[in-house]
């Protein structure tokens, strides 16, 4: 899972793309929906359009761009390797070429964008509908079963035909619909809209009795579905292999791992906020929200933008106790087992720092749900004086820790700490995470050794560049 979002630069350089394997079979105009994309460009009056391709479809980029320029007369720019996840629209790269719109090809997380108009062309991957229906009947022999059918976006085009084959046999089957863009809030009772999918239930309580059937390969999308709807049994059909199965992912074990990371976040003193997207709408709002949350919790935060995170990059920030990744819903669940410090989601940081938010069994991966006015937003409770705070003990270290919130309007502590106040437990109230980290290091830098080191005059140093200093040339001659 880590390789889907974080990547090593050497791995990218060594990767070999096979054009024959990457190129889809059949008519390219139909696969890439050239007519629909051309209508989008003409109707919008765009003169410059960015075409974003994932690595798997990059072999066809030149042909598709030439075809689009031929039918629209607009100037096309191909966007290849994206700064973050390929499922997200790379608005930053599109703005570099002054593009008026983006056509995003391939799998997508369907996160709404901030600025540019976007058209999603998923690519019509082939699906054996007959085989899929046969597998569905094997997995659900009871004809009265309540099943919600979800699919990867690349197979959404075939869901209508699958529905025709199954709706007469299964009267309680429900097919989800792919929704692109930032759709308005649900207005119909019983409507569920999440992960860019929408389906309708006759009654809200009916969802508790449903099973989920996913059409697509194993990946981040399926993992997000299973963690979010963790109370429902999942089955899947992989079109590449033609086999179906009941998903055996131990959701409880995965959730226990995530809750362990919440406990690590409670113990952290320094939080690194990783910017994992620059195009998803609301990312600036959630960054500000996380800054306020961390500050109210008495922790220190730093905002880091390192592109695609990998262990080597994040290992440079030793002072950071835990990272929180602000990314789209699919890329938020980054496996941090290979990293030196844990990586949590904004929802997990809220569980750790907001006393008013409790674990209810519902897991959230979309950070926009946490913002004011959203469905899952919970206000921070009033600040509690340190003397009245209930002490808490870490379940990991066994040490005492502070869990009360600080007053957001309280003035910053003075720079001088000659006089420090003590609370009722006679403990010092001020603590510096930086000083604590420095004290724990085995090597703290060069010591001055005042009065012990002889004073020497400045001498002439070496000249040149590291590859060939001037004195090295004289020595060789």
From Swiss-Prot:
Biological process according to GO: protein histidyl modification to diphthamide
Domain of life: Eukaryota
Alphabetical UniProt keywords: Iron, Iron-sulfur, Metal-binding
InterPro entries: DHP2, DPH1/DPH2, DPH1/DPH2_1, DPH1/DPH2_3
Required cofactor(s): [4Fe-4S] cluster
CC terms in the record's Gene Ontology section: 2-(3-amino-3-carboxypropyl)histidine synthase complex
An MF annotation (GO) of this entry: 4 iron, 4 sulfur cluster binding
Described function: Required for the first step of diphthamide biosynthesis, a post-translational modification of histidine which occurs in elongation factor 2. DPH1 and DPH2 transfer a 3-amino-3-carboxypropyl (ACP) group from S-adenosyl-L-methionine (SAM) to a histidine residue, the reaction is assisted by a reduction system comprising DPH3 and a NADH-dependent reductase. Facilitates the reduction of the catalytic iron-sulfur cluster found in the DPH1 subunit.
Quaternary structure, from the entry: Component of the 2-(3-amino-3-carboxypropyl)histidine synthase complex composed of DPH1, DPH2, DPH3 and a NADH-dependent reductase.
PANTHER family linked: 2-(3-AMINO-3-CARBOXYPROPYL)HISTIDINE SYNTHASE SUBUNIT 2, DIPHTHAMIDE BIOSYNTHESIS PROTEIN
Database matches in NCBIfam families: diphth2_R, DPH2
Protein name: 2-(3-amino-3-carboxypropyl)histidine synthase subunit 2
Native organism: Gallus gallus (Chicken)
